[in-house]
A protein has these predicted regions:
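Glycine-centered loop-to-beta-strand initiation motif
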Residues: 76-82, 173-187
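Gram-negative bacterial Sec-dependent N-terminal signal peptides
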Residues: 1-20
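Short amphipathic beta-strand segments in non-cytosolic proteins
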Residues: 58-68, 157-171
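Mid-chain, structured segments of secreted extracytoplasmic proteins
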Residues: 63-111
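Beta-strand-rich domain onsets/edges
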Residues: 21-32, 105-143, 205-240
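A short, solvent-exposed beta-strand micro-motif common in secreted/extracellular proteins
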Residues: 90-97, 188-196
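Short acidic/polar inter-strand loop motif in beta-rich domains
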Residues: 42, 98-104, 197-202
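Beta-strand-rich structural segments
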Residues: 31-44, 137-149
Length: 240
């Protein structure tokens, strides 16, 4: 029995980091916006059947000058297609607050944990207000962004800026949650951050000991140096 318990603990501890190492992001190709899951910098996108099937109830919202509006998400073999048109100045946010959790056992005590993946697409660098639990938003200043957790600035947290060919730049948010990047390359950037809240809480009537959040912000830099194209696509992860 003790051996079985040890194996279970090891397996759950292994599965959780695999999910958390991944992130979700939004990318726009013409008029089509798609939610992707995988490793943007590695050119890896999860599929169905596969890890994309782990998502339970991702919710998309359009945030614009006229207010907020729910958007549909159509699951395809290689991501979710976001329904509805997005205009300059709009933002799209997506979050899945029902992604399957996991459990760990230590000293005979079993604890539940959850992971909350989220993403934002900003069509301009104009200042935006946070909406997601963990959110990165433009401030309106060139190359400046702000990280929030539950509506409050989140200091001393790593934020990575990534482009499709894998180039990555890391910054740490200051006391006001602000980070600054040069954004020298022309094209798409995905900013990514992680935060774990160990205060515990409750989701769908079930208590959890910690909540791990991963969030991203997609922006387009209209000027700058041309970059090398992304490398060959990495194969999707093995389902587990």
């Amino acid at each position: 029995m003790k051996k079985l318990l040890l194996v279970t603990t090891v397996l759950t501890a292994f599965i959780a980091p695999v999910a958390q190492a991944h992130h979700v992001w939004l990318e726009q190709d013409g008029k089509t916006v798609k939610l992707q899951f995988g490793e943007f910098g590695e050119n890896q996108r999860e599929t169905t059947p596969g890890l994309l099937d782990k998502f339970v109830a991702p919710k998309a919202t359009l945030v614009g000058a006229k207010g907020e509006r729910d958007l549909t998400l159509e699951k395809t073999a290689k991501g979710y297609v976001v329904g509805g048109a997005v205009s300059a100045g709009d933002a799209i946010v997506v979050e899945d607050n029902a992604y399957p959790g996991w459990e760990t056992t230590k000293d005979g005590k079993t604890s539940q944990h959850i992971w909350v993946p989220a993403a934002r697409l900003a069509t301009t660098f104009a200042a935006q207000q946070p909406k997601l639990a963990l959110d990165i938003v433009p401030t309106g200043k060139a190359g400046e962004f702000k990280l929030f957790y539950k509506g409050q600035p989140l200091p001393k947290t790593k934020v990575n800026a990534i482009i499709p060919n894998g180039w990555t730049k890391e910054a740490v948010s200051d006391d006001n949650g602000t980070v600054t990047f040069d954004l020298p390359w022309k094209g798409m950037y995905v900013l990514e951050a992680h935060h774990t809240d160990k205060a515990g809480g409750e989701r769908a009537g079930a208590a959890y000991a910690s909540a791990s959040h991963t969030t991203s912000l997609t922006v387009m830099q209209p000027k700058g140096v041309a970059t090398m194209a992304a490398g060959p696509a990495m194969a999707p992860s093995a389902a587990h």
